[in-house]
Amino acid sequence: MVALAEFRATVREWLADNLSGEFAALRGLGGPGREHEAYDERVEWDRHLAAAGWTCLGWPVEYGGRGASVEERVVFHEEYARAGAPARVGHFGEELLGPTLIALGTDAQRARFLPPIRRVEELWCQGYSEPGAGSDLASVSTSAVLDGSGDGAEWVITGQKVWTSLAHVAQWCFALVRTEPGSTRHAGLSYLLVPMDQPGVEVRPIEQLTGGSEFNEVFFDGARTPADLVVGEVGGGWRVAMATLEFERGASTLGQQVGFRRELDALIEVARDTGALDDPVVREKLTRARIGLDVMRWHALRTIGDAAGASVTKLVWANWHRGLGELAMEVLGAAGLVHGGDLSDWQRLFLFSRADTIYGGA
C-alpha cells in the first residue's frame, strides 16, 4: 500500500507540473460529445505523455509499456481525471488494439504497430458497427475477398461502417468483416487492420444533436490491405473482436467515475443555487445518485479483470449517467429546454448520455 501511495503521489505531482504552460488550456477538454475540441493540441499532449512514459501503462515492458499492475492503472486513471487532464486521442490504439495485438497478434504485427501506437504516431479507429449491425454485431455484412497469393496477396474490402469515432483523423482502422461468402452470424468473420489513407476509403462525418461530428460513416469501395494483416485466424474474428471489447471495459472506467462525481457535485451546487434542492424529491434523487456512484465504484473495483463483471459495470455506469442527464434537466427546469445557440454543458450531457447505453457495446 505504501508503494501504491507513492505511485499516486508521483502521478499527481507530474500532472500538476505538466498541465501548465502550453497545456493548461486543455484542462477538461475533449470529453464525450466534445472529442473535436482542441484536437491537434491534444495529440501533442498525448505525445508529451508518451515521451514521459505515461502511455501504455499496462503493456508488458518488452512491448514498450511499464508493466503496471491493475491497481497502478486504476490510480493513474483516477488521478488523470481528478487533474482535469484532457481526453486522450490515442485510446483506440493504446487501450483496445494494443492489448489485442499483444494477446492475439503475430510477432510481425506487434513489431510493426505497437511502437507507433505507444508514441502516438499512428491513430486508430474501430470499424465494428454497420447500418444493419449495431448491437447485433454478428450481422456485419462488410466483405473482404482475398486477391492474389503469396507475399503480394491482399484483402479487397467492400461495405460500410457507421458511428466510427474519430475515423476522420485516424490513419488506421481495425475492422470486423466477413471473409467467408455465404457465412452467417459469428462464423466467417475476420479482424482486419486497414489503412485509411487510400482511394477506396471515404469518410463522412455525422453531425450530432450536440453539434459535434466525431462519429463518422466509413465507406469501403475496393479498399485494400495486405493479407497478413488479419489478427487471429481467418474466420475467427468474432473471438478477437470480443477480446477487444473486454479490454475497452477495463481499469479506465474508474477514472471515468471520477468525472461522474465531478458532474454530480456540480449538479448539486446548481440545485442549491436555483432552489431546487429545497424540493425533497430532488434531494432524494440526488442522494440516490450519490449512492449509485459509490456502488458503481465498488462493483468496478471488485470485477476488474473479469470480462463478465466488466460488462455489468458498463451497463451500470451507462444507465447511471443517462439518469444523471435526466436529473440535470429536472433540476434546471425550463432553463434546460431552451438555448441561445450553443448548448450548455448540462444540455450536452443530457443529449450525449442518451447514447451511453449503446456505444461501447450495448
Segments (PLM) and residue ranges:
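Alpha-helix capping/hinge segments and adjacent helical runs
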Residues: 66, 308-311, 315-362
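Loop-to-helix element that buttresses phosphate recognition and phosphoryl-transfer chemistry
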Residues: 268-269, 284-305, 318-330
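A short core secondary-structure module
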Residues: 140, 153-204
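A short, Trp-centered hydrophobic/proline-enriched beta-strand micro-motif
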Residues: 120-128, 176
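A structural signal for short hydrophobic beta-strand segments in well-ordered beta-sheet cores
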Residues: 142-146
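Glycine-rich beta->alpha junctions and the first turn(s) of the following alpha-helix
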Residues: 201-297, 355-356
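Amphipathic, small/basic residue-rich leader segments at the start of a protein or domain
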Residues: 1-89, 112, 116-119, 341, ...
